[in-house]
């Protein structure tokens, strides 16, 4: 299962969850049956019932632990499920080229989804840039010239007139 951005359409979350459960159960069933094949019809039916119960138990355990298993999906099963499309998940026969981004799991904003995130403007970021000297929080009244933030000499006005006069 490979994550990507697709513009083909969206499914409800319940539909996608049931598809993923079906894929996981089918893969677990396929692997267990191929290992436990004894030959008789009764043995296969018993194995199917046992495997469904095991798949549910494994799924419940994994949900509690927050673990998402990596599964190999049969190509035929993928061809049958082509009608399912999602903007977040792409079912593919190929393995992903890179591992999932783990840095998202470490980000505190991802872990705490109830907190509000500060918006930022597009473009150049000034993160980590601080002024060299501390600012002063007092009025200066005896200055007639100063240096602005670009390093240019400027005249300080003693009085500012506003409105018509």
From Swiss-Prot:
SMART domains: NGF. The keyword Iron-sulfur does not apply. SUPFAM superfamilies: Cystine-knot cytokines (SSF57501). One of its GO terms (biological process) is nerve development. Residues 1-3 form the signal peptide. InterPro entries: Cystine-knot_cytokine (IPR029034), Nerve_growth_factor-like (IPR020408), Nerve_growth_factor-rel (IPR002072), Neurotrophin-3 (IPR015578), NTF3_N (IPR045815). It is found in: Secreted. Glycans are attached at residue 112. Keywords: Cleavage on pair of basic residues, Glycoprotein, Growth factor, Secreted, Signal. One of its GO terms (cellular component) is dendrite. GO terms for molecular function: growth factor activity; nerve growth factor receptor binding. Belongs to the NGF-beta family. This is Neurotrophin-3.
